[in-house]
């Protein structure tokens, strides 16, 4: 067989030539396709991750995240389908399947004294959320992180430094470290294995998604967000609540920032309003 054209270090489809001689010495040659894939391993969740990956084979092109205002008949943003079609294979969620469940996620970069009250509200309303934390947050707020875990919330990985230009602007080694250092710290100090990752700013690349997947993580984006992260420019509570309720949809992934006084103020009414519309809050489990 002639396999000289096959590069076993690079993912792709190649052509090899196989030759066979019969008893009379007649030779038959045939071209066959050889597919080189990333080695993979199955997680307990049932998902598959790449291992020993040559991340250079993935596109590092910067991909911003945004999906516009168009919605379908069920109020679900139609702009998300573009991302699902292209990147969903990297165990990435942009929205959950249509159902009466919605998923509440909160990003924690810095603590502004609001998380304790948010946790109180969630406990009172019997809602489990996902809190995406950075490494500095975990180090500076161990009591809050422990409470999140103790009260049954999911603690997700939001990178070490929250690079403002996006994770994909870093080197492969730096990106791996941004995920791994948070993972290892939380596991060591809290005995908690994280399994969800949120990209800082939402920007990513195909390569970044593959890197996060290779670390055993599911990437979680969102189907609702609004400008709530500027601490000194908080939006009006009433209009923000109306906006959040008007855009509710089955399978929604809500992104709220925990440093927002508006979010802290409207959270209880938001939960009640969603339930009044027939929705319930789901738990973001490891199962795909």
Question: Where does each model-flagged region fall?
Answer:
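Serine/threonine-rich, repeat-prone extracellular segments and beta-strand-based repeat modules
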Residues: 1-32
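Alpha-helical scaffold elements lining the catalytic groove of polysaccharide deacetylases
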Residues: 114-117, 163-190, 203-250, 262-269
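Active-site beta->alpha N-cap acidic-glycine motif
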Residues: 56, 62-167, 175-188, 192-194, ...
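A glycine-rich, coil/turn loop motif that links secondary-structure elements
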Residues: 4-8, 197-202
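Catalytic grooves of carbohydrate-active enzymes
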Residues: 247-285
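Extracellular interdomain linker/stem segments of modular secreted and single-pass surface proteins
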Residues: 35-43
């Amino acid at each position: 067989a002639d396999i000289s054209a096959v590069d076993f270090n690079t993912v792709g489809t190649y052509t090899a030539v196989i030759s066979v001689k019969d008893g009379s010495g007649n030779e038959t040659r045939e071209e066959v396709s050889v597919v080189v894939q990333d080695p993979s391993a199955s997680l307990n969740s049932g998902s598959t991750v790449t291992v020993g990956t040559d991340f250079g084979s993935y596109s590092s092109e910067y991909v911003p995240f945004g999906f516009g205002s168009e919605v379908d008949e069920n109020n679900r943003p139609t702009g998300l389908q573009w991302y699902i079609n292209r990147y969903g294979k990297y165990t990435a969620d942009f929205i959950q399947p249509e159902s009466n469940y919605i998923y509440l996620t909160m990003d924690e970069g810095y603590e502004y004294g609001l998380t304790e009250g948010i946790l109180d509200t969630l406990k009172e309303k019997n809602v489990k959320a996902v809190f995406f934390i950075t490494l500095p947050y975990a180090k500076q707020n161990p009591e809050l992180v422990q409470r999140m875990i103790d009260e049954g919330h999911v603690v997700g990985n939001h990178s070490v430094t929250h690079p403002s230009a996006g994770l994909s602007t870093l080197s492969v080694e730096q990106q791996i470290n941004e995920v791994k250092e948070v993972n290892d710290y939380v596991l060591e100090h809290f005995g908690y294995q994280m399994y969800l990752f949120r990209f800082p700013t939402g920007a990513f690349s195909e390569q970044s998604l593959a890197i996060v997947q290779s670390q055993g993580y599911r990437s979680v984006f969102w189907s609702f967000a609004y400008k709530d992260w500027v601490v000194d420019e908080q939006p009006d509570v009433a209009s923000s609540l109306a906006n959040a309720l008007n855009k509710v949809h089955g399978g929604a992934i809500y992104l709220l920032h925990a440093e927002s006084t508006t979010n802290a103020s409207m959270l209880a009414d938001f939960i009640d309003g969603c339930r009044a519309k027939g929705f319930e809050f789901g738990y973001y489990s490891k199962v795909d």
